[in-house]
């Protein structure tokens, strides 16, 4: 196939990562990046998720001035500070989470949306601080909070500083929930590592997208550690639902309506 034809095809069609059918780009975006054939939910950018659940022109971003430093002077294949700059340029984001307030079908809420495209959605000190401040803002203003997780876990380039964010966010959520305020946690694929082991699983209501990968360590690591074969659906949203760790699996098309229903019932 000529290169020009391949390029034109890539602009017009999207191949499903699950069932391999070709989806027209029109249908792909019409269905909110969900395969119309097999219901596979493609990853979304944080800005797309905000546009998907927040009422038009109601989004007010908060804490955009918080950026990660490099206190450890960490360097693997390249310096951490260089890696941050590259991800900022590629994604147009300052960090792996967007935080702010907005309305969901006319109900005000604080919202944090993680973005896997920024360093695998990893949680460093800036991500932890942004979410913590948003939780504290919600507590002060008596607002419900919605957090959409998409993360590989704690950011290794920040060492213990990234791990302490797990406890910091969890403590802030405890103060919010002790005031009777609502926290809705939404698990998208993947939600793993330190994010899974902390705030993602602390919601009063925990929702998940269909077939989302949710768990702590990778399946292969767990199998090698335990020397046992795990169930085929292990670390899936459906497995967690069957075992009581998730309250509801919600298709993307129904997500805003479902969040609004829960917020309305709580109000």
UniProtKB/Swiss-Prot annotation:
Swiss-Prot/TrEMBL keywords: ATP-binding, Chloroplast, Fatty acid biosynthesis, Fatty acid metabolism, Lipid biosynthesis, Lipid metabolism, Metal-binding, Nucleotide-binding, Plastid, Transferase, Zinc, Zinc-finger
Pfam families with a match to the protein in the record: Carboxyl_trans (PF01039)
Subcellular locations according to the entry: Plastid, Chloroplast stroma
Record-linked InterPro entries: AcCoA_carboxyl_beta (IPR034733), Acetyl_CoA_COase_Trfase_b_su (IPR000438), ClpP/crotonase-like_dom_sf (IPR029045), COA_CT_N (IPR011762)
Top EC category: transferase
Family, similarity comment: Belongs to the AccD/PCCB family.
Recorded metabolic or biological pathway in which this protein acts: Lipid metabolism; malonyl-CoA biosynthesis; malonyl-CoA from acetyl-CoA: step 1/1
Gene3D superfamilies on file: 2-enoyl-CoA Hydratase, Chain A, domain 1
Organism for this UniProt entry: Cyanidium caldarium
Catalytic activities: N(6)-carboxybiotinyl-L-lysyl-[protein] + acetyl-CoA = N(6)-biotinyl-L-lysyl-[protein] + malonyl-CoA
Record text on cofactor binding: Binds 1 zinc ion per subunit.
Subunit annotation: Acetyl-CoA carboxylase is a heterohexamer composed of biotin carboxyl carrier protein, biotin carboxylase and 2 subunits each of ACCase subunit alpha and ACCase plastid-coded subunit beta (accD).
Any one GO biological process: fatty acid biosynthetic process
Function, in words: Component of the acetyl coenzyme A carboxylase (ACC) complex. Biotin carboxylase (BC) catalyzes the carboxylation of biotin on its carrier protein (BCCP) and then the CO(2) group is transferred by the transcarboxylase to acetyl-CoA to form malonyl-CoA.
UniProt EC number: 2.1.3.15
Lineage, uppermost ranks: Eukaryota, Rhodophyta, Bangiophyceae, Cyanidiales, Cyanidiaceae
Molecular function in Gene Ontology: acetyl-CoA carboxylase activity; ATP binding; carboxyl- or carbamoyltransferase activity; zinc ion binding
Binding site for Zn(2+): 16, 19, 35, 38
Domain of life: Eukaryota
Zinc finger (C4-type): 16-38
Protein name (database record): Acetyl-coenzyme A carboxylase carboxyl transferase subunit beta, chloroplastic
Gene: accD
UniProt domain CoA carboxyltransferase N-terminal: residue ranges: 12-267
Reported cofactor(s): Zn(2+)
Annotated GO CC locations: acetyl-CoA carboxylase complex; chloroplast stroma
């Amino acid at each position: 196939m000529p290169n020009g034809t391949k390029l034109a095809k890539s602009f017009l069609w999207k191949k499903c990562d699950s069932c391999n059918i070709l989806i027209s780009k029109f249908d792909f975006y019409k269905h909110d990046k969900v395969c119309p054939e097999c219901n596979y939910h493609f990853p979304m950018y944080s800005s797309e998720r905000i546009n998907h659940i927040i009422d038009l022109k109601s989004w007010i971003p908060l804490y955009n001035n918080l950026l990660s430093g490099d206190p450890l002077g960490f360097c693997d294949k390249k310096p951490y500070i260089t890696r941050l700059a590259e991800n900022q340029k590629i994604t147009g984001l300052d960090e792996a989470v967007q935080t702010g307030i907005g309305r969901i079908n006319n109900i005000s809420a604080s919202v944090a949306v993680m973005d896997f495209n920024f360093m695998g959605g990893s949680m460093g000190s800036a991500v932890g601080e942004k979410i913590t401040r948003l939780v504290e803002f919600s507590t002060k203003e008596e607002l419900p909070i919605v957090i959409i997780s998409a993360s590989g876990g704690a950011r290794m380039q920040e060492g213990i500083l990234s791990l302490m964010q797990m406890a910091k966010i969890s403590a802030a959520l405890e103060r919010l929930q002790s005031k009777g305020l609502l926290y809705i946690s939404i698990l998208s694929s993947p939600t793993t590592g330190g994010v899974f082991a902390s705030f993602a699983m602390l919601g009063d209501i925990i929702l998940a997208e269909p077939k989302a990968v949710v768990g702590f360590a990778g399946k292969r690591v767990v199998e090698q550690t335990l020397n046992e074969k795990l169930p085929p659906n292990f670390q899936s949203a459906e497995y967690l639902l069957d075992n009581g760790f998730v309250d509801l699996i919600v298709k993307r098309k129904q997500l805003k309506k479902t969040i609004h229903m829960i917020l309305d019932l709580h109000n």
